[in-house]
Swiss-Prot record:
Keywords: Acyltransferase, Luminescence, Transferase. Acyl transferase is part of the fatty acid reductase system required for aldehyde biosynthesis; it produces fatty acids for the luminescent reaction. It is an enzyme of class 2 (transferase). InterPro entries: AB_hydrolase_fold, LuxD. It comes from Vibrio campbellii (strain ATCC BAA-1116). Pfam families: Acyl_transf_2. The active site is at S114 (charge relay system), D211 (charge relay system), H241 (charge relay system). This is Acyl transferase.
Amino acid sequence: MSNQCKTIAHVLPVNNGQEIHVWETPPKENAPSKNSTILIASGFARRMDHFAGLAEYLSENGFHVFRYDSLHHVGLSSGSIDEFTMTTGKNSLCTVYHWLQTKGTQNIGLIAASLSARVAYEVISDLELSFLITAVGVVNLRDTLEKALGFDYLSLPINELPNDLDFEGHKLGSEVFVRDCFEHHWDTLDSTLDKVANTSVPLIAFTANNDDWVKQEEVYDMLAHIRSGHCKLYSLLGSSHDLGENLVVLRNFYQSVTKAAIAMDGGSLEIDVDFIEPDFEQLTIATVNERRLKAEIESRAPEMA
């Protein structure tokens, strides 16, 4: 088995000299061909290299896969997380999507986890997606933030907010984040329902039965508001909101999302499909190679590290 890194790195220049880093994983040779190209939007405080395993699963099954790090987030792209907002996440996703279109990429299927799923729901009616798959996707941002942070900071006047909100060891700039939530209506369940109601994009949502941050009944509510009915909910049994908490949960996530992508590429919402599973050595090699690639890119631009 080759130890050569198959990941292809791209850099997209954006406004004010900023850059979005994108990684490309081509489909494996001799893999069954697919109609769709996959774009992966990582969850909050997760970098694109955290999804190396999922990219390998999808590539092994014939998908061309792209991932990116959002602006003002963890990872390789420009900016610091204390300036991150949901609108920044939206703009980063749309920039990468439109870049793929300029490359002639058609039939883009989007996979989004956690907070990035809320971004995906925001734009689902604006982008021409083949399908959307979400995992532990946030539908009620205010409620999820209260669960994650231990307090409903969105209830405070702006001038009473702390300087930072500590989210999994990362410092969110509270004022810029909260102002954006209110100004662009990111905060409520109803705002999510309004965005998805008229979409015709097929959607599979994965919840986790031990997720303390996202209420499964609210995900059901969201799907019930999609008038097309082209949607289905599945549960990742034994998982919490942290899809990487152990290898069993992580493997189930990889398998389930890969099967969903195969099914939806074929026009179905039923994920009882055959798939090819990469072996552990292959996943390990891909992960190690991407860590080296990340370190190499950071060494060329220390200010991004």
